[in-house]
């Protein structure tokens, strides 16, 4: 720095100058220097102004560095979160081999619906994560019930229904995942209040859960299950078409139908 300063002084024929360090914490990041060709041209007021500018620069640099550090921390947390989500999803699918891939197919459709609805990116991210995890609560359900080829008894049906609450209890412990855990809890709620576990209706149901409900039904009906063969996409779409505004959110259904008819969506 000194040789640059010396060259500048000689080149510009400066005979007086002021300097104010840019300090953050215990570090000096640089120095603001002002020079003049007249010996008496610079005053204490000039030095005060230069010092103020140096301090403002220090604040801005500190803030930028803090924001950069925070961004890196958030990216790390996001990576850890995504790895956790993937691990939980794989664990759930191993529990029920008949629905292997179900959660990811639901996520694919649910995200396409959210995008068709022109929702902000954070909604789409929540929908994706909730979809990938929506059956995580089935980890507590015995495998022989999940894979039972015939109809379930009333007690078995009630036991299967507990997976929404169980999934909520698992995911609610993850930081920043309140909307996701709530979507897991509510994805079997229905617009007319006929769903479970709380019998919510209309906009009492989180939007992410309303989207997940439609995507889940379509994928489930279109795919093979231990107790029935696949019913096909057309039957699944007719189901949500007839239930639009009654048991399924009408706007979500409209977006889902458009995804298949206009966007040629496939699982």
Residue ranges and their predicted role:
Residues 44, 73-76, 82-267:
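Metal-dependent catalytic cores of enzymes that make or break cyclic nucleotides
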Residues 1-16, 36, 190-201:
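Signal-transducing coupling segments at domain and membrane junctions
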Residues 57, 63-66, 70, 77, ...:
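Heptad-repeat alpha-helical coiled-coil signal-transmission segments
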Residues 31-41, 149:
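Short beta-strand-to-loop transition segments that serve as allosteric relay/switch motifs
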Residues 51-58:
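Allosteric cytosolic regulatory segments
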Residues 22-25, 39:
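Sensor-regulatory modules in signal-transduction proteins
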Residues 28:
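Glycine-rich acetyl-CoA-binding "A-motif" of GNAT/NAT acetyltransferases
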Residues 15-23:
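A short, aliphatic-rich beta-strand micro-motif
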């Amino acid at each position: 720095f000194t040789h640059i300063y010396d060259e500048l002084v000689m080149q510009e024929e400066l005979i007086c100058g002021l300097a104010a360090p840019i300090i953050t914490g215990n570090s000096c990041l640089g120095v603001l220097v002002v020079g003049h060709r007249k010996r008496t041209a610079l005053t204490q007021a000039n030095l005060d102004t230069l010092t103020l500018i140096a301090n403002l620069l220090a604040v801005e640099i500190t803030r930028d560095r803090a924001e950069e550090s925070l961004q890196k921390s958030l990216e790390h947390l996001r990576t850890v979160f995504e790895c956790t989500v993937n691990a939980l999803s794989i664990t759930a699918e191993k529990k029920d081999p008949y629905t292997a891939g179900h959660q990811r197919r639901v996520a694919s459709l649910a995200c396409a619906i959210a995008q068709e609805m022109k929702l902000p990116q954070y909604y789409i991210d929540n929908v994706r994560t909730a979809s990938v995890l929506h059956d995580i609560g089935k980890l507590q359900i015995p495998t022989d019930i999940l894979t039972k080829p015939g109809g379930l008894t009333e007690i078995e049906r009630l036991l299967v229904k507990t997976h929404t609450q169980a999934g909520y209890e698992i995911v609610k412990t993850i930081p920043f995942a309140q909307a996701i855990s709530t979507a897991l809890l509510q994805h079997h709620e229905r617009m007319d209040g006929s769903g479970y576990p709380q019998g919510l209706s209309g906009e009492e149901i989180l939007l992410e859960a309303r989207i997940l409900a439609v995507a889940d039904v379509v994928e489930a009906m279109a795919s093979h299950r231990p107790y029935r063969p696949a019913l096909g996409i057309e039957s699944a779409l007719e189901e949500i078409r007839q239930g639009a505004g009654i048991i399924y959110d009408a706007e979500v259904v409209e977006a889902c139908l458009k995804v298949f008819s206009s966007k040629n969506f496939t699982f």
